[in-house]
Amino acid sequence: MSSFLEISRLYKTFPTPKGPLTVVKDFDLRIRKGEFIALIGHSGCGKSTVLSMVAGLTDISEGGIVLAGKEVTAAGPDRGVVFQAPCLLPWFTAFENVMLGVDQVYYTASRLERRQIAEYYLSLVGLADAMHKRPGELSQGMRQRCGIARAFALSPKMLLLDEPFGMLDNLTKMELQDVLLDLWQRDQKTALMVTHDVDEALYLADRIVMMTDGPEATVGDILEVKFPRPRNRRELLENPEYYRLREYLIHFLNERSHHRPAPREAAPPAAQPPASGFKRLINTFASS
């Protein structure tokens, strides 16, 4: 099976006063290009540790991660990361925060082209009228919109999201879920998202990877989510299959998360839209 991201027998062990603690053990996952994968499990099970290793922000104890044929050994612009807190520089405007990364990635583009890229993604996330405000002048939801725009503007090969909406109220969370889906469907980036929200996982993902409880957490089960795209929240909530899958996830989290069954095979890749015009500039850097 052709994989865009391949995680093989991944281990993460931390030293403690009582001896080594293995947080993640024998974690295997294959993700195809264009898939949106949700990684779900109880708090503290190691979800964010796995994502951090994929991002190159945490060292791997054993095993390996290969992205687009290259081994992951450190952080890099081929992976755009959105954290729970957007980590914006407070003395820069939203536009300037996005431009920091754009200037590094599109270094051969003209200044005008780089500005257009930053403005394009800030407009897509709804910050056209607020892009020249500093983070202290923005709401938490607006700051997270900026974080999402910054990640997409880098034109990464893969998008990594670590509970990006966990600090938001429900209404803002739903709005930003739709913003994320619109951007993802527009750019068709491969995405791996950590969440503890069952409904969020069902709404966003093509497959949901369920992790067992830690320590020594691993893949417990994988659920395929076959709802057609683009997805409509109201239609999903009226679909009996949505509640069947929801119950399956809740049952795993409540009853089966201590077990370690073998994962299922990955779903087929999502279709890739043709690039044209402005997209060609972005895709040129994404493939380099």
What spans do the regions from the language model cover?
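Short coil-to-helix segment of the ABC ATPase nucleotide-binding domain corresponding to the Q-loop/switch region
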Residues: 92-101
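Conserved ABC ATPase "signature" region
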Residues: 111-130, 182
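Conserved signature/switch motifs of ABC ATPase nucleotide-binding domains
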Residues: 133-136, 154
